[in-house]
Amino acid sequence: MVPKLDLSIEMLSDPVCLNVGNPHTVFFVAEVTKIPLERLGPLIENHQMFPEKTNVEIVQVESTKNLTVRVWERGAGITKACGTGACAAAAAAHLLELTDRNIDVKLDGGTLSINWLENGDIIM
């Protein structure tokens, strides 16, 4: 079982938190376009649970091979793409048994292919 953080901010809850070189908080939702990331991103990034702040990913599972992700980068705001964010989203989705290890992550700036190897390495 993957530990989810007991955190709720408006319509977002139970994120998976990972560190893939920097901290990420990943929320799974039915439809990424319905989440007001411009408003919720800074609330999550600066939440007291994250003393070093956190990156935020809003993730929609399209299939076992595809995710759609929106990104709020700590210190930068909404960005069109984030490599470590795509890796964090892919790892979280696989840990929750929602996707395979080798998937495509669609971001506003384009699609990244992510492969999480059995040895723990993540290839982008």
Residue ranges and their predicted role:
Residues 1-81, 90-123:
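Active-site proximal loop and beta-alpha junction motif in alpha/beta enzyme cores
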Residues 86-88:
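Conserved acetyl-CoA-binding loop-helix of GNAT-fold acetyltransferases
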